[in-house]
Amino acid sequence: MLGSTSCSKDDDDDNNNQNNNNVVVNPTDEDDIKETAKYNFFGAELYSNETFTYGKFEAKMKMAYAPGCISSMFLYYNDSYKGNGEVWNEIDIEVIGKEPNGFQSNIITGKLEKKVTSEKIHKIDSPVADNFHIYTVEWTPDYVAWFLDGKEIRRSDASNDTKKQVAALVKPQSLRFNIWSSASTEWVGTLYQKNIPITQEIDYIKVYDYDTETGTFTEKWTDEFDSFDSKRWGRGNWTMENVLERPKNVVVEDGILKLKLTKELK
């Protein structure tokens, strides 16, 4: 059930232009630092091989929660990271370690060298990791909207978007899900090794096309994860701050796709 922050319209907030992901802060617990030195840490990312320009994206998930951990669903322009003038396009749903009773929505535009963001935290009445919820993003030329269990939580309209972020979402984006650990303890908290392994579970993913003439969505496909479809999905194999995202941490078990945050002795 939704808490008091059930739905919000976007407004201009200069504090939302901060990019917290690049702050490197070491864990403050001495025993945790010692244990960290013994291990390598591994995360996971699932990404669609297909890209989309507008649409509706729905997933039934049990998001992961632990201090220091990020569990996410997001749309992402695949060349955003390149810099050198390339635009950044991204739409996020993230459960962050310091906010167990809610999730963060965000649009990221601008460029690698100067990102524009609009983070908002949305509270619910119980920890998101306790149950499966249906998370949905609608992306059109006129608005971006976020939903939880069918209820609209936030909407950013192009008509009153002072940062012009909706209009800046011009690139085709892949659909992605990941679990990782940020170097910024200020943003997500400290990852304590006793909490690992941590798992994000996905029951199904559903994608809809958007018709710009009629303003309607039409179901395109649903994946219920009876198996892993390598034609539809790829597995991440790269570093995300404190972890290496590796393919073997994306698995399908009993009709559930699982993204795992794990550790191994060096």
Where are these regions (language model features)?
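C-terminal motif of bacterial Sec signal peptides marking the signal peptidase cleavage site
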Residues: 3-6
